[in-house]
Regions:
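P-loop/Walker A phosphate-binding loop and immediately adjacent motor/lid segment at beta-alpha junctions
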Residues: 102-114, 161-186, 223-228
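Well-ordered beta-strand positions
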Residues: 123, 145, 201-204
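Conserved beta-strand segments of the P-loop GTPase G domain that flank and frequently precede/overlap
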Residues: 7, 37, 92-93, 125-127, ...
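Beta-strand-loop-alpha "switch" segments that mediate conformational coupling across diverse proteins
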Residues: 183-187, 192-224
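Walker A/P-loop phosphate-binding motif and the immediately C-terminal alpha-helix
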Residues: 2-42, 46
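Inter-motif core of Ras-like GTPase G domains
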Residues: 119, 134-153
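NTP-binding/hydrolysis catalytic cores, primarily Walker-type P-loop NTPases
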Residues: 218-243
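P-loop/Walker-type NTP enzyme "switch/lid" segment
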Residues: 36-119
């Protein structure tokens, strides 16, 4: 069974980008089979990662979660792959889909789904929703490692001040979260040290990368990054989470 890594964080903290780049770092560093699950139904990410793919070349994991029984065969059918990399795939929702497209999957079915994905990959990275849906709740509960991602701004601080008390339930395992700060903007003044002081024990900081910003604009997030500082930091984080 593969290792499950859950990425949860505040809105606009760069969770999806971080999840994709972390999966890439794991793939490159450990020569692993890696699956990235994109849980968001409010802004489906498959069309963001694969903007030039025809709709008929993409598949939605919503079709799997809507089935009575979840099998390896059905999950494999819905994996979207990168033609440049073997054993590196994505599961998510398609452009135009939303929370009403498919029947809501219960937590038991989400657990079955995640267990199947763990039989298909060495590492499964789950990009959880900021307000956890059933799939995200189960992923956090099942995860071998949980990353809580914040951005160094007042909005992120306000989000966690509001949501962490709600997540006091032991199933969210807040005391086990690995806290990271992701610098997603290049502002004149970034209150990074103040953010670290506010959030407490910060395990890592992801530096701002102009190259990542350009990839985001161009719909090229699955492409390699040459930014040495960014890559070095992701390698360190990948090693901490996977080894």
């Amino acid at each position: 069974m593969g290792k499950l890594v859950a990425i949860w964080g505040s809105p606009e903290s760069g969770k999806t980008t971080f999840a994709v780049k972390l999966a890439t770092a794991v793939y490159n560093q450990f020569q692993s089979t890696v699956l990235t699950i994109l849980a968001d139904q409010t802004a489906p990410a498959l069309s963001v990662l694969f903007p030039n793919r025809k709709k008929e070349d993409l598949s939605s994991m919503g079709m799997v979660l809507a089935k009575t029984e979840i099998t390896q065969e059905e999950v494999i059918k819905c994996i979207v792959t990168d033609p440049k990399r073997a054993n590196f795939g994505f599961l998510g929702y398609m452009d135009g889909e939303n929370v009403h497209t498919y029947a809501k999957a219960g937590e038991r079915k989400c657990r079955d789904f995640l267990n199947v994905t763990k039989t298909l990959a060495n590492v499964v990275v789950v990009d959880c929703t900021s307000l956890p849906d059933n799939l995200s709740k189960v992923a956090i509960n099942m995860a071998d490692e949980i990353v809580r991602l914040a951005s160094p701004d007042l909005k992120s601080m306000a989000f966690f001040n509001s949501q962490l008390p709600i997540m006091a339930d032991t199933s969210f395992r807040c005391e086990e979260h690995i806290l990271g700060i992701n610098v997603v903007r290049q502002d004149v003044y970034i209150p990074l040290e103040e953010a670290k002081e506010h959030f407490g024990k910060v395990s890592f900081t992801v530096p701002y990368s102009q190259e990542i910003r350009i990839q985001t604009i161009n719909g090229a997030l699955i492409e390699p990054v040459k930014d040495a500082k960014f890559n070095d930091r992701l390698r360190i984080v990948a090693q901490k989470l996977v080894e």
